[in-house]
Amino acid sequence: MSSGFGQRAVRSLKRRLGLTDRERIKKLLADPPAVEEDRIVFTSSEDYSGNPKALYLYMKEEGLLEKYRVTWLFERRENCFDFPEENVESLCMFNEEGKRSWKAQQAVMRARFVFYSHNVNWVKNFRKEQTFVDLWHGCGYKGALKSDATRVFYDYLMVTGERYIDIFRDVMDDPDGNILDLGYPRNDMFRTRRSDAAAYLASLKERTGAEKALLWMPTFRQSTVKRLDTDIALSSSGIPLLYGEEQLRQLNDCCRAKGVLLIVKKHHLQVTYDLPGEGIDHVLFLDGNDLRKGNADLYELLAQTDGMITDYSSAAIDYMLLDKPLGYTLDDFDQYEDARGWSFDNVKDYMPGHHMYTMEDLLAFVGDVAEGRDPYAADRARILPQMHTYTDGFSRRIAEYFGL
């Protein structure tokens, strides 16, 4: 029996035994379940990460979850795990056939509060008795794709600072929207030790003999999601300034000589990097799965580093809170401007750090960090209050605002 026939037989059997997920969802939309005051849902794009995870952990530690029945929604079945708390359940958003799960649909439709990092437009039924809070996934430099952003539903959306309120109202085509500059819960993780991030980084440094560590977080150029693809390809590797093996080995030699471990964290939307690995010992390439296996939260890991390299990512805005050196790769600035645009004018004026257009610029930044030089500290102090209304207590502030 062919696999195609077998799948059809399974679907046919399911239909005879009961309603399919699609049919159940239609019934839920036609006859919505009652909203229950003690139900709360969390979900994030990379599964148990980012702002929803940080807010959840804060509420758990403060005993604020005890009065709720909590559901965590996961996009990928392989990331789904059971929580030890009796009042916390985990559900996959999709069934075995890759279709939307009716149980996930029901969980959201019954929840009093829904906290998420991107969007939950698939719910299709939003009622006034519910509160949908988009904690969002970053206030950065790059312009948003309006065609995509205007599909995002929320009752409230979080930003880091007052400057971003009007920016997001414009992007979301929501001039009177509830955009709140309460900050991001994930930035609380700079001060916590909930994961094994410190030990994880220490082991990597010990393995290489490095004394200092840099984290490089390039934003995506070639995306796994085609509607988000900027199609910028100055570098065959997919990473700015690393145009090929020669540049990678040059960077690795510099890091080895300076006693620096450089960790390149791949953006979850970036297609796989195309780089050699043989003989590369001081430049390490990691992704979200690597951090998950090491029980290392990304933002707790960032707090342990000595500096950061990025470009147009919101992570640079967050990293300013740590008051550590920043380096910006800008070799594709003009191409990115044409492809995506910027959140505000004169964007380079709000990048308080090394502006790196060449490999020599990048090597100079590595050298400065290795030798403890920080020439842009005053610039960071000047820019920080323009990007962040608050510098701590982000989860607490959100919990208090919504009376959780």
Walk through the language-model features, giving the residues of each.
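A donor-sugar binding/catalytic signature common to diverse glycosyltransferases
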Residues: 114-139, 293-340
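Catalytic donor nucleotide-activated moiety binding site of glycosyltransferases and closely related
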Residues: 71-86, 216-217, 221, 247-291
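Membrane-proximal basic amphipathic "stem/tether" segments
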Residues: 1-37
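Donor nucleotide-activated moiety binding/catalytic core segment of transferases
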Residues: 96-111, 268-314
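Active-site and donor-binding regions of nucleotide-sugar-utilizing enzymes
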Residues: 39-194
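C-terminal alpha-helical cap of glycosyltransferases
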Residues: 391-404
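Catalytic binding pocket for nucleotide-activated donors in carbohydrate/polymer assembly enzymes
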Residues: 151, 277-281, 312-387
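A nucleotide-sugar donor-handling region in carbohydrate enzymes
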Residues: 10-25, 141-145, 152-234, 238-239, ...
